[in-house]
Amino acid sequence: MFDLGWTEMLVIGIVALIVIGPKDLPVMFRTIGQFVGKAKGMAREFSRAMNDAAADSGVNDVTKSLKAAVNPVNTAMDSVKSAASDLGKFDPESETGKLAADKAERAQNAKKIQAATARAAADRKLKEAQEAQARASELEAAVTPPEKNET
């Protein structure tokens, strides 16, 4: 507190013993201790009152927002850390996990439906192409005269 070493305190104690005397020295130390205790209590009370006044006026919120504005990297890292911790807490047996599993199953079923639809469309186009080729063959046969046998 006063930045005194052991040797300085020893010298002060010896001087106090000589000046005050051994009879009154314990009473003086007790009085000094009570005074220091009261001073520390008053300092604590003053500090607590100042902190309460700062909290009531919203200074703490302003301080937090200023610190966040000064160092946005920490703010971003805090959100990343919280997201990572949320992912670590993921429980597949929870309602959210069940919904995620249902969503994945629906996505897989949608892909199966799309594949089946594409296959059906390809089969339909193939059938239409075969029918068109057969019709073209019939029309070509009707247009082309039959070959004559020359004997």
From Swiss-Prot:
Major subcellular location class: membrane
Region (Disordered): 102-151
Biased composition (Basic and acidic residues): 121-130
Annotated Pfam families: TatA_B_E
Membrane topology designation: Single-pass membrane protein
GO molecular function term, any single one: protein transmembrane transporter activity
Keyword presence, S-adenosyl-L-methionine: no
GO annotation, cellular component aspect: TAT protein transport complex
InterPro entries from the UniProt entry: TatA/B/E, TatB
One Gene Ontology term from the biological process aspect of the record: protein transport by the Tat complex
Domain of life of the native organism: Bacteria
Biased composition range(s): Low complexity: 110-120
Subcellular location: Cell inner membrane
Transport is among the record's keywords: yes
Keywords (A to Z) from UniProt: Cell inner membrane, Cell membrane, Membrane, Protein transport, Translocation, Transmembrane, Transmembrane helix, Transport
TM region(s), chain numbering: 1-21
Subunit structure: The Tat system comprises two distinct complexes: a TatABC complex, containing multiple copies of TatA, TatB and TatC subunits, and a separate TatA complex, containing only TatA subunits. Substrates initially bind to the TatABC complex, which probably triggers association of the separate TatA complex to form the active translocon.
Stated role: Part of the twin-arginine translocation (Tat) system that transports large folded proteins containing a characteristic twin-arginine motif in their signal peptide across membranes. Together with TatC, TatB is part of a receptor directly interacting with Tat signal peptides. TatB may form an oligomeric binding site that transiently accommodates folded Tat precursor proteins before their translocation.
Family statement drawn from the similarity comment of this UniProt entry: Belongs to the TatB family.
Name recorded for this polypeptide: Sec-independent protein translocase protein TatB
Organism lineage: Bacteria, Pseudomonadati, Pseudomonadota, Alphaproteobacteria, Rhodobacterales
Gene (name only): tatB
